[in-house]
């Protein structure tokens, strides 16, 4: 609670993987961003979120939860609960400026995979299964473009060994090129809307270092040094990066 802002989650997977994804992709930790992540488990978002208020704790609080939309397109008990949960949390958000709510359309596992993270998930298959047939079937399902197939498969794998254990397995394959799902990025930007130029430059330098094998990106190193010395505005450096990546 002593962080500058808080993200509330309801699962082990989010608690384990969000800090790792942020560190690997941005080069900074949640602690460096002044963000604490709290797993409420069965406590209920409403109970804890009420602490963040004009008369209580004046800090931004982002709630991350699943809508549990059915991958078959049919209404299920889980999707009904997701709809009810959204109605309650949206009402809570409307009457409290300190709270933001961000939804995974399906579940964390499915939306992580949908965010262009197929390679990371494929890498976990041989850690989950030893049977050759099961491995081949799983690879085929994950490579499918049909959400009913790849969605069911990743949930099957996660439930097979437990979602917490699966998150730990998956964490071994998170790299700087892993994509953070948009709803998680939105939650981070809600609780941390402003960044110092020093922190932005640190993130920028880390991101550029991921492309160090590219000649067109290597040329940015000189201007990064200029920016650190105050000889070049950070906005000019960012503009130059976008121009080079678009070529």
Predicted regions and their residues:
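Acidic, divalent-metal-binding catalytic cores of TOPRIM
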Residues: 1-247
